[in-house]
Amino acid sequence: IETPVGVVEVSLAQDGLVSVENVPSFRYGEGVTVNVPEWGAVSGEVAWGGNWFFLVESQGPPVDAGNIEALTDFTWKIRQSLKRDGITGRDGGEIDHIEVFGPPSDSKIADSRNFVLCPGKEYDRSPCGTGTSAKLACLHAAGKLAEGQMWRQASILDTVFEGSVRTEGDESVIPLIRGRAWVNGEATLILDPTDPFRFGIQDCGDSSSFKAGT
């Protein structure tokens, strides 16, 4: 499957579960601290799993489905603070995903539970494939996950991905993510070259050249 960051391989098992071999993933920074309004110093790791992530362990509101609004506010403040302080991924890559972790609701089905803030101030209903890849890379870099060892990541809704890594001989690992998914829609994106916002609305800069109503 072609993705914006490269081709990923997908395997479908007879039981309906899908395995995805993701792009090379790695931890870029550890012990990164940012001052977050109303929360003070928050420490985390910066990692690449197909997107740039800031991963936070056991800080902020409890990772529970009843705290989605509070978790959204907390992670959004982290993202804004990272941008304010110029903290980025490699080559200035914007950290546009914030992932916080807490204990699982049931240790029999998962090793950890997460909440993932995505661009647009949305959150991921799943454990997040790229986010789980970033987590696996951090665990491996910290010596907490051996090659081939299984990690079970639960989402804020308690859906679970299983993940492991294959080493590459350098700083990166190849994550293998296994889980279940359902097709819930199809879309065709049309990029009109005359549309100034065809690639989305981010930092629009000087919009004085745009006509009213565009």
For the regions a language model picked out, list residue spans one by one.
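Active-site proximal loop and beta-alpha junction motif in alpha/beta enzyme cores
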Residues: 1-214
